Amino acid sequence: MSNAEHSSNFIRNIIIDDLDSKKHDTIITRFPPEPNGYLHIGHAKSIVLNFELGKEFNGRTNLRFDDTNPIKEDTEYVESIKEDVHWLGYNWSELHFASNYFDEMYKRALLLIKKGKAYVCDLTPEEIKEYRGTLTEPGKESPYRNRSVEENLDLFERMRKGEFEDGSKVLRAKIDMSSPNINFRDPIIYRIAHASHHNTGDKWCIYPMYDFAHPLEDAIEGITHSICTLEFADHRPLYDWFVKECEMENIPRQIEFARLNITNTVMSKRKLKQLVDEGIVDGWDDPRMPTVAGLRRRGYTPKSIRNFCKAIGVAKADSTVDYQMLEHFIREDLQETAPRAMAVINPLKLVITNYPEGKSEILEIENNPKDESAGKRAVTFSREIYIEREDFMENPPKKYFRLFPGNEVRLKGAYFVKCNEVIKDENGEVTEIHCTYDPETKSGTGFTGRKVKGTIHWVDANNCIPAEFRLYEPLILDDCEENEGKHFLEQINPNSLTICKGFIEPSAKDAKPQDKYQLFRHGYFNVDPNFTSDDNLVFNRIVSLKSSFKLK
């Protein structure tokens, strides 16, 4: 981290104070995802924050799966999360599952009952909600609140044995139904769920609630700084209450920071799952998705995501980050590393009528104009080439400097060509254009006889590779996740994906999935790992070449 990033990271300052005061000898942080979906860019921010803090202070960072809800969780998500954390460049100190602590949590729940701090409640979910009260009205005590310790122990044991139906009973903490903090109004700490668990199978039919389980997990693992997002700030007193009343030996500290919001991006796992389930996208790794898997398939690099997460900093108030900031960091990374190539994604044939038939020559084109050490690559040139259809207009507007009848342009790395004839089909659509070239104007010869204002790219029609190019726009039209109460599905961009069939120069013949290229004038592209095969080369556009965005 830079000094600016350090000074703005209030969590880092808390850790420094704790270490200086000898409150802790070392720090232990954790990343605790629930395995009920794929990680997204917001989770990446938490991953980077926790692991970088652990690394900076020579501490440890655990990966813990908060798997306390068997109905929504799956091993598919466990494996994808582990893959994503590794891909981002991090190795956890210890791997844990909350479900491995179920026995210990059960013992602590028994302790609360014995202390008169928990009771079994028979109210329905609707009644519990009604009894809870509101922000302006206190709650009402459950008629089951004053059951004896013995009765509560008996009922809780029978809950564990599976004698009761789902939803018929819960275990609640006995705190204060009139507390101004609604989270203190006798929160549920165990519910009945007759469902197989991905890790514990059918051993349990009662499962702890997040507010109860999470502080115990942190305490069991000796976590020193439990870092979470701002929506848990009101839960912190309850977090501390459970640690104290359950008589945990280690006392972790919960610290909240602002979650990541990005323009034109849905960050809710529930909504992302809806996009997948309803077929609006083609899976969790669709390149339009903000999931780590989607960003990886799109072509984002671990370095670009880490740098983005570090640059946005750690704040105490929610804000929204411009999506262009994320794009800035992938451009910055690939500008230095991506090999260059020419590709035509919407091809129009150009015939050079005065170029000898059957002739082919090899031209040398620089790989990176900003880096001479990158060298040059060989590209063939012949009588027939493809150019972009948008690089020709029969009746152009003013200040259009590309090809039109009578105009001359430079072909990148080759010659000047002038348009002399336009060929059309029976519908009046241009099918090819005929040009003449000037052999004296070859690039690299030092020709200065005249200048042209336009340079366009091309590929040799006799030596190129067919390819599919997938061009992406934001999946969400509006700048915020919810706009004036609109359902987010009403904001889906119908033009978020455009598929083009074109050609790329032969230097890409050995391209492998996840290889990245800068395609001249088009942007940065990634070879798609899902759709690419030996006879079908598919490129995802990661980002365009330029943006008006300026990093402050």
From Swiss-Prot:
Keyword Cell wall biogenesis/degradation part of the UniProt annotation: no
Catalytic activity: tRNA(Gln) + L-glutamine + ATP = L-glutaminyl-tRNA(Gln) + AMP + diphosphate
Motif ('KMSKS' region): 266-270
GO terms for cellular component: cytosol
Pfam families: tRNA-synt_1c (PF00749), tRNA-synt_1c_C (PF03950), tRNA-synt_1c_C2 (PF20974)
MF GO annotations: ATP binding; glutamine-tRNA ligase activity
InterPro entries according to UniProt: aa-tRNA-synth_I_CS, Gln-tRNA-synth, Gln/Glu-tRNA_Ligase, Gln_tRNA_ligase_bac, Glu/Gln-tRNA-synth, Glu/Gln-tRNA-synth_Ib_cat-dom, Glu/Gln-tRNA-synth_Ib_codon-bd, Glu_tRNA_lig_a-bdl
Top-level taxonomic group: Bacteria
Entry EC number(s): 6.1.1.18
Major enzyme class: ligase
Gene Ontology BP, a term: glutamyl-tRNA aminoacylation
Keywords: Aminoacyl-tRNA synthetase, ATP-binding, Cytoplasm, Ligase, Nucleotide-binding, Protein biosynthesis
Classification via HAMAP family: Gln_tRNA_synth (MF_00126)
Protein name from the UniProt record: Glutamine--tRNA ligase
Organism, scientific name: Clostridium perfringens (strain SM101 / Type A)
Gene behind the chain: glnS
